[in-house]
C-alpha cells in the first residue's frame, strides 16, 4: 500500500520503542498511581519524552500539510463518533451474548472500566490536573506511540498486520491495571472494549495520512469524557 504520509526516521523508531518499553515497565510495577499528582507527573514525563523523540516527525507533519485542515477536522470528528458508536455496539453485543456471570455476581454488577473509575477518582481529587493529562498528554503520547510508531511502521509493509499488531498492543497495554488478580474473562472484557477505538483511529490515520488527525480525535474523546466527570 502506497501512503504519502510523513514517516518516522529509524532513530525515532528505535528511541520511541525504548520509551514504550520503559512506560510498560513502569505500568507493570505501578499499575495504579496513588494520586492525581503522581499520574500527572507520569504522563508529563512521557509527554516530554515523546515530544523530544518525535520532534522531527511532528515538525514535518505540521509544516508539510499533505491533507487540508478541513479534512483533518472532519475525519477527527468522524473518528471520534465512529469509535464511540463502535464501542457502544461492542458492549451491547457482549452484554447480549455473554453469560450473565460475566457482568453480575451475587451482589450486583461487578464489571466496570477501571481506567474510567480511576479517572473519576483523579477528577474528584483535582479536576484541572486530571483534565490536563487526560486531554493533552495522553492523546499525544498514545497516538504517537501506538498509531504513529507501531501502526505507522508496519502500514507500508502490510496493512492488515499493522491493524492487528497495533490493536493487540494498544488493548493489552490499557488492560494492564486489571491483570493482577483478575480472572481471564474479566481481562478479556476490558481488552475487547479498546478494540474499536484503535481500529477507528488507525483508519482515520490511513485516510488522512497525518498523525494530527487521530491526535485531535483522541483529544475530543478524552475532553468529552473528562467533562462528564465535572
Where are the regions a protein language model picked out?
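Interfacial loop-to-helix junctions that mark the boundaries of transmembrane helices
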Residues: 36-40, 118-122, 154
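Juxtamembrane helix-loop-helix connectors linking adjacent transmembrane helices
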Residues: 61-138
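Short, functional N-terminal and low-complexity linear motifs
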Residues: 14-19, 114-120, 165-171
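Transmembrane helix-loop-helix hairpins at the membrane interface
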Residues: 125-230
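N-terminal, membrane-interfacial amphipathic/helix-forming hydrophobic leader that caps
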Residues: 1-88, 96, 164, 179, ...
Amino acid at each position: 500500500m502506497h501512503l504519502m504520509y510523513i514517516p518516522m526516521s529509524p532513530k525515532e523508531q528505535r528511541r520511541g520503542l525504548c520509551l514504550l518499553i520503559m512506560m510498560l515497565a513502569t505500568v507493570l510495577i505501578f499499575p495504579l498511581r496513588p494520586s492525581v499528582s503522581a499520574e500527572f507527573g507520569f504522563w508529563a514525563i512521557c509527554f516530554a519524552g515523546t515530544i523530544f523523540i518525535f520532534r522531527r516527525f511532528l515538525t514535518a507533519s505540521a509544516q508539510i500539510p499533505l491533507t487540508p485542515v478541513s479534512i483533518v477536522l472532519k475525519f477527527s470528528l468522524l473518528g471520534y463518533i465512529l469509535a464511540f458508536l463502535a464501542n457502544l455496539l461492542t458492549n451491547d453485543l457482549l452484554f447480549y451474548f455473554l453469560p450473565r456471570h460475566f457482568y453480575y455476581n451475587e451482589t450486583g454488577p461487578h464489571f466496570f472500566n477501571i481506567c474510567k473509575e480511576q479517572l473519576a477518582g483523579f477528577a474528584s481529587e483535582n479536576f484541572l490536573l486530571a483534565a490536563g493529562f487526560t486531554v493533552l498528554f495522553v492523546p499525544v503520547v498514545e497516538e504517537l506511540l501506538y498509531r504513529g510508531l507501531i501502526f505507522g511502521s508496519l502500514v507500508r509493509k502490510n496493512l492488515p498486520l499493522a491493524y492487528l499488531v497495533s490493536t493487540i498492543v494498544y488493548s493489552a497495554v490499557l488492560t494492564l491495571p486489571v491483570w493482577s488478580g483478575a480472572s481471564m474473562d474479566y481481562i478479556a472484557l476490558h481488552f475487547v472494549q479498546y478494540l474499536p477505538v484503535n481500529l477507528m483511529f488507525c483508519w482515520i490515520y490511513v485516510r488522512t495520512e497525518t498523525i494530527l488527525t487521530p491526535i485531535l480525535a483522541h483529544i475530543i474523546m478524552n475532553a468529552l469524557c473528562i467533562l462528564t466527570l465535572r
